[in-house]
Regions:
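C-terminal functional module detector
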Residues: 2, 6-13, 17-228
Length: 228
């Protein structure tokens, strides 16, 4: 997910309980969506997901992350600045019952701040940080277990666009997808182990993969220029 964000794709997080394939109770995994106005409609909910105003929980309604950049910008928001500048980030972890763990702020795939502690009903755990952006990038928040190994909450990103430039945060991540698609094309060739899964028009399938590879190659080239 972070690799795709680093390539400039704006992807909303959403999730749900895969019952009966998953043994956890229904509602254990859910998506919070910010919906404008007092009336909730299906269209507003879908639009909220499409626009990235989401937080995914693996612990039902027992906890929530409230991410704000520059006090008002939440997940899905695009912040535009004309030149290198700082943004102020805050996240609040609220709970319905006492939980210990840690909250983290992630920018361009790297943890830039973390806070360990205990959140209690009416007494959320709060983390503040400042991040400088010289190039376009993104920020999100997540709640981990005390060891920092398991995700329980994750927000969609806030995007910071500098001088109207695209997000090209990592040349390596873009190259990763070029290599990945090259491997797929190799595996689906006649005689390849995955060829049997494409009994129809293989050339059409390959054309789609090549088109995607060309997009990533363009991102690689742009990333090298932006990050030089």
């Amino acid at each position: 997910y972070y690799r795709l964000l680093n390539c400039g794709f704006r992807l909303s997080l959403a999730g749900g309980t895969d019952y009966p394939c998953n043994r956890v109770p229904l509602g254990s995994v859910l998506t919070y969506v910010e919906v404008p106005g007092k009336k909730i409609t299906y269209q507003k909910w879908i639009d909220g997901i499409a626009e990235g105003r989401t937080v995914v929980s693996r612990n039902a309604h027992n906890e929530f992350l409230n991410l704000k950049v520059n006090k008002t910008a939440g997940p899905g928001t695009i912040i535009r600045i004309k030149k290198e500048g700082k943004v102020n980030i805050g996240v609040s972890w609220s709970v319905s019952k006492e939980i210990s763990g840690q909250i983290e702020l992630v920018s361009n795939g790297r943890v830039i701040a973390r806070q360990k502690g205990v959140a209690r009903p009416g007494n959320p755990l709060v983390l503040h940080a400042t991040q400088t952006f010289s190039r376009s990038g993104w920020i999100c928040s997540r709640r981990m277990d005390s060891l920092g190994r398991i995700h329980f909450l994750h927000s969609s990103p806030v995007y910071v666009i500098v001088d109207d430039q695209p997000i090209r945060a990592s040349t390596e991540d873009a190259e990763y997808f070029v290599t990945w698609i090259d491997n797929i094309l190799k595996q689906i060739e006649p005689g390849g182990p995955w060829n049997k899964y494409f009994p129809g028009d293989l050339e059409t399938v390959k054309a789609h993969y090549r088109k995607a590879r060309d997009i990533y190659k363009t991102i690689v080239a742009e990333s090298r220029v932006i990050n030089k």
